[in-house]
From Swiss-Prot:
This is DCC-interacting protein 13-beta. The record marks Q234, S235 as: Breakpoint for chromosomal translocation. High levels in brain, heart, kidney and skeletal muscle. It is a peripheral membrane protein. The lineage of its organism: Eukaryota, Metazoa, Chordata, Craniata, Vertebrata. The keyword Repressor does not apply. GO terms for biological process: adiponectin-activated signaling pathway; cellular response to hepatocyte growth factor stimulus; cold acclimation; diet induced thermogenesis; glucose homeostasis; negative regulation of cellular response to insulin stimulus; negative regulation of cytokine production involved in inflammatory response; negative regulation of D-glucose import. Residues 488-637 form the PID domain. Residues 643-664 are annotated as: Disordered. Residues 1-428 are annotated as: Required for RAB5A binding. Residues 3-268 form the BAR domain. The keyword Cytoplasm applies.
Length: 664
């Protein structure tokens, strides 16, 4: 017998589209078999009906032959021979009737009954298991949808536990029903062969027994053939029993796995994450926009193929291209209060698709895999080794810390070297750029820690700056909170969110800011850090001040003369950063870069900083100051008007822009 195709029980839990596609082939085969079995049963019942009719007909014939004697023929003389002959024929017909009756009974037991049992037992079982599998799959999809909607923040642990148990129960139920369904379909491939041959064996045996007295030669030839067929059926029966035992043992082993196999995100604290993947596959939730403000999430099967991200819905024969991953960027994002979301951005900076994984492990592995693929590692001779090396370097460079003191302690001595390539020692506005782009190691030392918290908390800075001042219990600021701002010609405020800061080795080029942006964003993506501190950045002609929007207390203050470099991101216009030169107690100076995300364009913040530096320069020359004041419009109170109050086109709330760019 040729090998029989079968469904792999090990793939039942994953429930991939490939398995579903193969399952549909088995289901189509079962449907075809059901239709054919019904037609075959009708034909066999017709034969059985004809045989029963033959029994009734021969019985009636025998009676009718005997009835000849009782007929009152007008010319009935000489009928005794006929009557005796008919009596003999009646006995022959009675004997023949016995043979037909025996044949009819044998056809019912060996031909019709097996095919009816096959239809009512095996085919009905497959149909019932199919319905149960469909119900279990629907319950699992509903529970996964409910689990996916769990909020990320302030979530009820009891609800989370209950939903997790519900997902595990639904997944276990789907696994059990799929295993039973797969086993039934696999066994059906054997049983259908037996079901087709066993009835015909019974039919043939019945006919042979019926004609045995007059067909010894024929029966001998048929006996040899039927013997071989019976041996084949017996061998199939042996194979079925062995396969059934094998599937039973395999089913028990698969059902005895740890409970964590069914529970999503089972190891939240310390999942085993493989950051060296160059290919990945699994189910993700895809965010689709259905209107101006409405979205839907669809659970689909995604997999990578070379440098492409593919998607394959259930029932589809093959996957389709969703995103070209070459030179793309990926990072974790907050989206609609859902957990484990990440966004793929195209090389031109446009936002791509947003996907949601079912666990932290899956989320980080997808991010790492896409990040590896985007670097075209898969084209190298040994992509796994390249991925391991790159991720080791990245982890060393982006180890996060949240203590400003630790950051200063771990800074390398090379970060405190004073740069000698400034245009002059009076802190010119724009440092002189180098002739060629420096390497990343020349800008930032490998392994430099990144600080994700703001420099000082608001309460600590309040105690340091205000001393014994009375604290307003209502959080309102005092009029004299920032006395130096009242005397400043320049006052401009922006809404910013702090992304991170790190020590740098040089401030001779803006490339150091771009490299710091890259490392900070990469660190946030790798370590799954979403939290950002929002502040008001006030730019004056003396300083840059970060103000708590709730308490109006200054979080950090940088002298404008200590700002040696500032730049906005070339593609993401809302990213802005600046380099601060701070003197150390040892007499040397340290350089640190600070990265922010702004509600407005970063170029506007850079323009304000640049103007503040110009004011510092021209304040030494009254004539130059007068020319500068004439060249720039002023407000009624004599402050500089830097920016209009019109919102950007790509922001939805004008009030946010007026708040972000209002004058203090």
């Amino acid at each position: 017998m040729p090998a029989v195709d079968k469904l792999l029980l090990e793939e039942a839990l994953q429930d991939s589209p490939q398995t579903r596609s193969l399952l549909s082939v088995f289901e189509e085969d079962a449907g075809t078999l059901t239709d054919y079995t019904n037609q075959l049963l009708q034909a066999m019942q017709r034969v059985y009906g004809a045989q029963n009719e033959m029994c009734l007909a021969t019985q009636q014939l025998s009676k009718q032959l005997l009835a000849y004697e009782k007929q009152n023929f007008a010319l009935g003389k000489g009928d005794e021979e006929v009557i005796s002959t008919l009596h003999y024929f009646s006995k022959v017909v009675d004997e023949l009737n016995l043979l037909h009756t025996e044949l009819a009974k044998q056809l019912a037991d060996t031909m019709v009954l097996p095919i009816i049992q096959f239809r009512e037992k095996d085919l009905t079982e497959v149909s019932t298991l199919k319905d149960l599998f469909g119900l279990a799959s629907n319950e699992h999809d509903l529970s996964m949808a409910k689990y996916s909607r769990l909020p990320k923040k302030k979530e009820n642990e009891k609800v989370k536990t209950e939903v997790g148990k519900e997902v595990a129960a639904a997944r276990r139920k789907q696994h059990l029903s799929s295993l039973q369904y797969y086993c039934a379909l696999n066994a059906l491939q054997y049983r259908k062969q037996m079901a087709m041959m066993e009835p015909m064996i019974g039919f043939a045996h019945g006919q042979i027994n019926f004609f045995k007295k007059g067909a010894e030669m024929f029966s001998k030839r048929m006996d040899s053939f039927l013997s071989s067929v019976a041996d084949m059926v017996q061998s199939i029966q042996v194979e079925l029993e062995a396969e059934a035992e094998k599937m039973r043992v395999s089913q028990q082993e698969l059902l005895s796995v740890d409970e964590s196999v069914y529970t999503p995100d089972s190891d939240v604290a310390a999942p085993q994450i493989n950051r060296n993947l160059i290919q990945k596959a699994g189910y993700l939730n895809l965010r689709n926009k259905t209107g101006l403000v409405t979205t839907t999430w669809e659970r689909l099967y995604f997999f990578t193929q070379g440098g492409n991200l593919m998607c394959q819905p259930r029932g589809a024969v093959a996957g389709g291209l969703i995103q070209d991953l070459d030179n793309c960027s990926v990072m974790a994002v907050d989206c609609e209060d859902r957990r484990y979301c990440f966004q793929i951005t195209t090389p031109n900076g446009k936002s791509g698709i947003i996907l949601q994984a079912e666990s932290r492990k899956e989320n980080e592995e997808w991010i790492c895999a896409i990040n590896n693929i985007s670097r075209q590692i898969y084209l190298t001779d040994n992509p796994e080794a390249v991925a391991i090396k790159l991720n080791q370097t990245a982890l060393q460079a982006v180890t996060p810390i949240t203590s400003f003191g630790k950051k200063q302690e771990s800074s390398c001595p090379s970060q405190n070297l004073k740069n000698s390539e400034m245009e002059n020692e009076n802190d010119k506005i724009v440092p002189k750029a180098t002739a060629s782009l420096p390497e990343a190691e020349e800008l930032i030392a490998p392994g430099t820690p990144i600080q994700f918290d703001i420099v000082l908390p608001a309460t600590e800075f309040l105690d340091q700056n205000r001393g014994s001042r009375r604290t307003n219990p209502f959080g309102e600021t005092e009029d004299e909170s920032f006395p130096e701002a009242e005397d400043s010609l320049l006052q401009q405020m922006f809404i910013v969110r702090f992304l991170g800061s790190m020590a740098v080795k040089t401030d001779s080029t803006t490339e150091v800011i771009y490299e710091a942006m890259r490392q900070v964003l990469a660190a946030r993506a790798i370590h799954n850090i979403f939290r950002m501190t929002e502040s008001h950045l006030m730019v004056t002609s003396q300083s840059l001040r970060l103000i708590d929007p709730q308490t109006q207390v200054s979080r950090a203050n940088f002298e404008l003369t200590s700002v040696t470099q500032f730049a906005a991101h070339q593609e993401n216009k809302r990213l802005v950063g600046f380099v601060i030169r701070v003197p150390e107690s040892t007499g040397e100076e340290s350089l640190s870069t600070y990265i922010f995300e702004s509600n407005s364009e970063g170029e506007k913040i850079c323009y304000a900083i640049n103007l503040g530096k110009e004011i510092i320069e021209v304040q030494k020359d009254p004539e130059a100051l007068a020319q500068l004041m004439l060249s720039i419009p002023l407000t009624n109170d004599g402050k500089y008007v830097l920016l209009n109050d019109q919102p950007d086109d790509d922001d939805g709330n004008p009030n946010e822009h007026r708040g972000a760019e209002s004058e203090a």
